[in-house]
A protein has these predicted regions:
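Helix-loop junctions on the cytosolic side of multi-pass membrane transporters
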Residues: 1-11, 200-210
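Juxtamembrane intracellular "pre-TM" segments in multi-pass secondary transporters
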Residues: 2-34
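Pair of pore-lining "gating" transmembrane helices in MFS-fold secondary transporters
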Residues: 26-44, 126-127
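Short amphipathic helix-loop junctions that connect adjacent transmembrane helices
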Residues: 49-64
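Juxtamembrane helix-start elements in MFS-like secondary transporters
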Residues: 61-70, 121
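Transmembrane alpha-helices of Major Facilitator/SLC transporters
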Residues: 66-87
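C-terminal transmembrane helical hairpin of 12-TM major facilitator-type secondary transporters
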Residues: 94-138
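A late C-terminal transmembrane helix in Major Facilitator Superfamily
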Residues: 130, 142-178, 185-188
């Protein structure tokens, strides 16, 4: 059931809808948080695309064992998303998650390149996906809060760009050595995600942004 009051609903046509998308794209703070989410989703989809081959072919686990690992890692994302609401300011959750993603992505890349054991890989991936989950709730909140006028279109664009990012990134992990390409993909997405967050924070006075984080 539609929850938006009737008097606040838009009655515009298709052309006006696309004009709304144009206005949204020109909102830099909204777009930066959406891009942060898109790059974080890139890490998620890179993991989804590569993990069956890494766990089953490289480490030699059965499909059932892989499904258990996949489920455990999914729990990490859900728990992190729930914990992120405990931060006083959503900027704190996003920045913490982005810094964690970068640090752990570098660790995963180095570990895979050096032929780490399964448990090292699994623990690092659990931690990486946990830090990624911290950004999902907080960044979505920040993005939607910065584009309230066209909230419906903003939500649609956010989802579209995030899944488009996953579709673009997923094939990249299959280029060359999957262990190397997966690690590199993680690091590149994590760097871009952190840069988008830092740039978005500069769209408000830096003193205000830092006060929100450490308050």
């Amino acid at each position: 059931k539609e929850s938006l009051p009737v008097e606040k609903r838009s009655k515009t046509g298709i052309v006006s809808t696309f004009r709304n998308f144009g206005a949204i794209v020109h909102n830099p703070r909204y777009m930066l948080y959406v891009l942060q989410l898109a790059f974080a989703q890139g890490i998620l989809f890179a993991y989804i695309a590569s993990s069956p081959f890494i766990v089953q072919q490289h480490y030699g686990f059965s499909p059932f064992a892989f499904s258990i690992c996949f489920a455990v890692n999914a729990v990490a994302i859900g728990v992190a998303a729930a914990i992120s609401v405990k931060f006083r300011q959503p900027e704190t959750g996003t920045l913490t998650g982005c810094i964690g993603m970068l640090c752990l992505s570098v660790c995963v890349m180095i570990a895979l390149y050096n032929g780490c054991g399964f448990w090292t890989y699994e623990l690092l991936m659990f931690a990486l996906l946990f830090t990624m989950g911290l950004t999902f709730t907080s960044s979505t909140t920040l993005a939607m809060d910065s584009e309230r006028r066209y909230a419906g279109a903003a939500s649609a664009l956010l989802g579209a760009l995030c899944f488009a990012s996953g579709g673009i990134v997923s094939p990249l992990v299959g280029l060359g050595n999957i262990l190397v390409s997966t690690g590199v993909t993680f690091v590149v997405c994590a760097i871009c995600s952190l840069l988008c967050t830092l740039w978005a924070m500069r769209k408000v006075p830096m003193k205000v942004a830092m006060c929100r984080i450490f308050r």
